[in-house]
């Protein structure tokens, strides 16, 4: 991991970098990385920040996104991503894992993990994926208190306030909540499950804060390009579960191939080579730490 062979950035440095990226002219594309390997591949592709999705993280644990995991578990995974990449990470902390005191504890745990930014939503527990039916919301006042709690105990954390009100209170309700959350101290707004390009434009016209779009697949929101979202007035876009979906489908294919043919040979071309793997995880840098380790030479 990068923190062993590189000088790790502090939480404040990472948070300041995230704030800078939010303000740049080009929209900030933030891919979801459910583990450190995915994070390293995303960094290699040239991304400047990463997203840890609650949905993707829980799925990687073999669990549904129903508020089952704990703040400590999520912070541990977030720490893996930060240590591996030295990039600012935006972490989905769901509802904050409980009431105001739970939110304060969660914020402290994210600070200790060197997380740059957190995303907190206004659903009630047990929460659900934002693109499913049956979501229930907390009051605006309760969400305000949660945002204020993060500000108080972790003032360097960037706060992205997510509202799921589009499904329950309509677009105007989502806009109203967004503006309340900004007044409470949110640094950016994530309006979940918008249903058209026009809705993205209307939110941008009525909310004066950096805006984050969710380009998740198979949901209520139509897929739009980064350029289209930027033109609509959004500053950030996440792809929360994309890499996990692709990886899971690759698992299905290779496991079925081995089961059917008794060998993986026909799938070799789809694999990362040993050399590519070692480059991704900075194998040589680790080896160089210990002069007593014989230099590994890979064949072509």
Curated annotation (Swiss-Prot):
CDD domains for the chain: ICL_PEPM
Coiled coil ranges: none
Annotated binding of substrate, by residue: 53-55, 129-130, 162, 192, 214-216, 245, 274
Cofactor: Mg(2+)
PROSITE patterns documented for this protein: ISOCITRATE_LYASE (PS00161)
The keyword Protein biosynthesis is assigned to this record: no
Any single GO BP term: propionate catabolic process, 2-methylcitrate cycle
An example Gene Ontology molecular-function term: methylisocitrate lyase activity
Keywords: Lyase, Magnesium, Metal-binding
Catalytic activity annotation: 3-hydroxybutane-1,2,3-tricarboxylate = pyruvate + succinate
Alphabetized SUPFAM superfamilies for the sequence: Phosphoenolpyruvate/pyruvate domain (SSF51621)
NCBIfam families to which the protein is assigned, alphabetical: prpB
Function text: Involved in the methylcitric acid cycle. Catalyzes the cleavage of 2-methylisocitrate to yield pyruvate and succinate.
Protein name stated in the entry: 2-methylisocitrate lyase
Organism field: Halalkalibacterium halodurans (strain ATCC BAA-125 / DSM 18197 / FERM 7344 / JCM 9153 / C-125) (Bacillus halodurans)
Gene name of the encoded protein: mmgF
């Amino acid at each position: 991991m990068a923190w062993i062979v590189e000088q790790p950035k502090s939480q404040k440095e990472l948070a300041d970098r995230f704030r800078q990226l939010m303000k740049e002219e080009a929209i900030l594309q933030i891919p979801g990385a459910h583990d450190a390997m995915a994070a390293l591949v995303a960094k290699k592709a040239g991304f400047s920040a990463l997203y840890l999705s609650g949905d993707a993280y829980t799925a990687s644990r073999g669990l549904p996104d129903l508020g089952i995991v704990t703040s400590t578990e999520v912070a541990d995974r977030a720490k893996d991503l930060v240590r591996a990449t030295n990039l600012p990470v935006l972490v989905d902390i769901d509802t904050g894992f409980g009431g105001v005191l739970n939110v304060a504890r969660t914020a402290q745990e994210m600070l200790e993990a060197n997380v740059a930014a957190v995303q907190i939503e206004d659903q009630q527990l047990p929460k659900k994926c934002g693109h499913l039916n049956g979501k229930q919301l907390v009051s605006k006042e309760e969400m305000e208190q949660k945002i204020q709690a993060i500000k108080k105990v972790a003032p360097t954390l960037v706060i992205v306030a997510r509202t799921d009100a589009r499904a329950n209170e309509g677009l105007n309700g989502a806009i109203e909540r967004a503006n309340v959350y900004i007044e409470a101290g949110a640094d950016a707004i994530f309006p979940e499950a918008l249903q058209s390009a026009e809705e993205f434009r209307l939110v941008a016209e009525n909310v004066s804060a950096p805006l984050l779009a969710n380009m998740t697949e198979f949901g209520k929101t139509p897929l739009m390009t980064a350029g289209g979202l930027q033109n609509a007035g959004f500053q950030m876009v996440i792809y929360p579960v994309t890499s996990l979906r692709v990886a899971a489908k690759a698992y299905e294919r290779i496991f079925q191939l081995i089961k059917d043919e008794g060998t993986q040979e026909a799938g070799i071309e789809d694999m990362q080579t040993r050399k590519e793997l070692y480059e991704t995880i900075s194998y040589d840098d680790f080896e160089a730490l210990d002069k007593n380790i014989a230099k590994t030479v890979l064949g072509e």
